């Protein structure tokens, strides 16, 4: 569908990606609108921490509706992108293998991944806003208590020398390719129409998103 093509060319998002990542490409994309009573997630980071002083994946949360305290706002722990990764989805682990945490890191780890974390914030913003974070930030969805939409598009971007979460060229259709201009094809890494040489995530056995 072409319905979300405009999300690929939000100038401030692309400028932020270039400023924080350098040469970049699309990493992944999904849409989220939990039903009332649902939407809670365990606290997690989307990617492992591969570079202590460097961004390597960026999250852009594009709000199609107001995000309020009642409709399941995203919770974040400010500054946690400098900490150790936590509860990373298997699909994003790649070649990373966790090391034994230090005593300081162990002290940070929550005993309950579902419980509120000290210092966490609930993000609220108006429709049309975009929230940009480091993908190593500790965060999660929360329960939607109101029966109103909270539609968001999650876009992630990564450096061009690193693999995508979803290798876009593997799912490429001719209508999609034909309607993309040269800049969009470069952004999605679908140009040329050849999967040879595309860097890919290491395959891991898993039964679901997190395990």
Which residues fall in each region the model found?
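Non-heme Fe(II)-dependent double-stranded beta-helix
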Residues: 1-52
């Amino acid at each position: 569908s072409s319905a979300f093509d405009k999300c690929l060319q939000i100038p401030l998002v692309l400028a932020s990606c270039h400023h924080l990542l350098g040469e970049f490409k699309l990493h992944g994309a999904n849409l989220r609108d939990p039903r009332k009573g649902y939407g809670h997630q365990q606290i997690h980071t989307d990617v492992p921490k591969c570079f202590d002083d460097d961004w390597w994946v960026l999250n852009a949360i594009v709000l199609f509706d107001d995000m309020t305290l009642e409709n399941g706002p995203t919770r974040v722990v400010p500054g946690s992108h400098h900490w150790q990764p936590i509860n990373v989805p298997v699909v994003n682990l790649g070649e990373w293998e966790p090391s034994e945490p230090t005593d300081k890191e162990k002290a940070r780890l929550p005993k309950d991944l579902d419980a509120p974390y000290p210092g966490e914030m609930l993000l609220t913003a108006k429709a049309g806003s975009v929230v940009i974070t480091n993908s190593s930030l500790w965060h999660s969805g929360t329960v939607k208590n109101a029966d109103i939409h909270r539609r968001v598009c999650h876009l992630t971007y990564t450096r061009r020398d690193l693999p995508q979460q979803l290798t876009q060229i593997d799912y490429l259709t001719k209508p999609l390719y034909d309607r993309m201009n040269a800049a969009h094809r470069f952004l999605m890494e679908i140009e040329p129409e050849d999967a040879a040489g595309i860097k890919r995530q290491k395959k891991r056995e898993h039964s679901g998103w997190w395990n």
